[in-house]
C-alpha cells in the first residue's frame, strides 16, 4: 500500500487547492488523451488555465507563453494541426509543451522518451536539463533506460521487482554489483563504465 506525505516547500500537497496544485506541479503521462476538434495550440494553451479568470480567457501574455512553449519543444510548425491526427512522438512533445506552459515548480514525467526518435529524445532531455538548471524546476522522471538516467539525473531511485529500493547519486547506485543484484541479472551484466547492459558471450567463443 502507498502511504506517507509529499511536501513542496515544506507544505503537504494534499493541503493545496486545485488551482495552487496546478500552478505548482505539472504532469506528463504516457497515456493518450482524447480531444475533440482541438489543435495542438489549444492543447498547449490548457496549461495556462490555472492563471485565467472566471471565463477562462487567455491574455496576450498567456498567448506569448503558449508560443514560447511550442517553440521550446520545436513544435511551432504543427501548432495548428489537429491534435488527434499527429504522431505519437509529436503528441509527446505537445504534452511536454502543455506542462511547460503551466510554469510549474515541479514537473513529473512518466517515460517521456517513449515514442521519440533519437533526435527528439536528446532535445527533450536537453529541455528538461535547462528547466532544472536555468528555471530552477524540480524535474522528476521515470525511465526504463538506465543509461539515460545515469547521464542526466542528479539523484536516482531504482525499484526492483521485489520492491527493493536504492536511492542516491547515479555514480553510487549504478554499479555493476548493485544493478545486477537489484534487477536479478542472470543472462548478462551491467557495465557501469559505459552505462549499458551486456550479454554474456556464448560458450565456446
Where do the model's predicted regions map?
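ABC ATPase nucleotide-binding domains
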Residues: 177, 181-205
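H-loop (His-switch) and adjacent beta-strand-loop-beta switch element
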Residues: 156-169
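Conserved ABC ATPase signature
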Residues: 82-86, 90
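Conserved ABC transporter NBD signature motif
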Residues: 4-12, 21
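Conserved catalytic motifs of ABC-family nucleotide-binding domains
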Residues: 103
Amino acid at each position: 500500500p502507498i502511504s506517507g506525505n509529499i511536501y513542496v516547500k515544506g507544505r503537504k500537497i494534499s493541503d493545496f487547492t486545485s488551482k495552487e496544485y496546478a500552478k505548482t506541479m505539472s504532469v506528463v503521462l504516457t497515456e493518450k488523451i482524447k480531444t475533440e476538434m482541438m489543435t495542438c495550440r489549444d492543447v498547449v494553451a490548457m496549461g495556462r488555465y490555472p492563471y485565467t479568470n472566471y471565463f477562462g480567457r487567455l491574455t496576450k501574455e498567456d498567448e506569448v507563453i503558449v508560443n514560447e512553449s511550442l517553440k521550446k519543444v520545436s513544435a511551432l510548425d504543427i501548432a495548428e494541426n489537429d491534435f488527434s491526427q499527429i504522431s505519437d512522438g509529436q503528441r509527446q512533445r505537445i504534452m511536454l509543451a502543455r506542462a511547460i506552459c503551466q510554469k510549474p515548480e515541479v514537473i513529473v514525467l512518466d517515460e517521456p522518451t517513449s515514442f521519440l526518435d533519437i533526435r527528439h529524445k536528446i532535445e527533450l532531455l536537453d529541455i528538461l536539463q535547462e528547466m532544472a538548471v536555468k528555471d530552477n524546476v524540480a524535474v522528476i522522471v521515470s525511465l526504463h533506460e538506465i543509461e539515460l538516467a545515469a547521464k542526466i539525473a542528479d539523484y536516482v531511485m531504482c525499484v526492483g521487482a521485489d520492491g527493493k529500493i536504492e536511492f542516491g547519486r547515479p555514480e553510487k547506485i549504478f554499479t555493476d554489483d548493485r544493478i545486477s543484484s537489484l534487477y536479478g541479472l542472470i543472462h548478462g551484466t551491467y557495465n557501469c563504465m559505459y552505462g549499458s547492459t551486456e550479454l554474456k558471450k556464448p560458450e565456446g567463443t
